[in-house]
Design a protein with these regions (language model features):
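Extended recognition/assembly regions associated with phosphoester-bond processing machinery
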Residues: 1-292
């Protein structure tokens, strides 16, 4: 928020699942605010600021865009009217999220796995959000992605977990002949333990592309060092494949940094160009020293 106040036209913040009163009250964020600003801190004002944050940002050049958000895919939202609207900056209220309508209208969007279709039937609905998690979770803020391409294309762990098949179908359905949504950059799904995703975030300097062609679920138990040894060091900057999903790491000064033992902060630098094939993403890593 301090960065946004200092440069409002250049800093854009997307709302994540923690920017919510329920999460803030349960996980100590309200206590942190009171500790910094006193017992009479205006919590209502802070919550209202959360309400004004967009849950997704489409960043692009006019014909090519990336979906930038905290969580994952939201099949109930159709961005085509927003992307086709005039002007460099435009906004749209989410309105009703038509997840069930989308699933029923798109046969085959989950591939051939009957288990994935069962998850969709159980968890997808048409609804108007009242909060980020009621009556259902907003996918842009909560949903996740699989790490490997050979696991079920839809699952549920805390929220829906999307594989490459439905992810790329949703991106294609969000596109038109004139405008393409090419991929996703996000920063969710972190853990205080070195599981498959956190190990890859640490091994790759804080920016990781899902569904690597040289990996499958048999590599899920690899350590950080094993990942570094078995993987060719990515280019920096890297090209952005169509339909790719990129996860950014979390701050080291957190339970995640303590639990996973990393001491660097990371950012992704996105370089746009007139043609999407020339877009690049760079990893910026800064070592951080602090007392634990």
């Amino acid at each position: 928020l301090r960065l946004k106040m200092a440069s409002p036209a250049q800093v854009h913040i997307a709302r994540g699942n923690h920017e919510d009163f329920d999460m803030a009250s349960r996980y100590g964020f309200l206590d942190e605010v009171r500790g910094k600003y006193g017992e009479n801190a205006n919590l209502t004002k802070l919550m209202r600021a959360y309400d004004l944050l967009p849950v997704v940002v489409y960043l692009g050049t006019g014909k090519d865009f990336l979906q930038v958000n905290h969580g994952g895919m939201e099949p109930g939202y159709d961005p085509r009217a927003l992307l086709a609207a005039p002007g460099n900056a435009r906004f749209q209220l989410l309105g009703e999220l038509k997840q069930k309508t989308y699933a029923q209208a798109k046969p085959g969007w989950l591939g051939e796995d009957p288990g994935a279709r069962e998850w969709a039937a159980e968890h997808l609905a048409d609804f108007i959000p009242e909060t980020p998690s009621t009556p259902r979770m907003i996918g842009f803020m909560w949903n996740d992605f699989t790490i490997f391409p050979d696991v079920p294309q839809l699952g549920y762990w805390r929220s829906l977990v999307f594989g490459p098949v439905p992810t790329r179908r949703i991106l294609a359905d969000a596109s038109t002949e004139q405008i393409r949504v090419r991929g996703v950059i996000r920063a969710h799904q972190h853990s205080a333990q070195l599981g498959p995703l956190m190990s890859r975030l640490v091994a790759n300097g804080g920016v990781y592309r899902h569904w690597q062609t040289h990996e499958d679920s048999s590599h899920g138990g690899q350590s950080v060092e094993e990942i570094r040894k078995s993987s060719r060091k990515p280019e920096n900057p890297q090209p952005i494949p169509d339909g790719s999903v990129w996860t950014l790491n979390v701050s080291p000064d957190s339970v995640y940094g303590t639990g996973c033992g990393f001491d660097f902060a990371a950012a992704a630098v996105l370089s746009l160009a007139p043609e999407f094939k020339d877009w690049r993403i760079s990893t910026l890593t800064v070592n951080v020293k602090f007392g634990r």
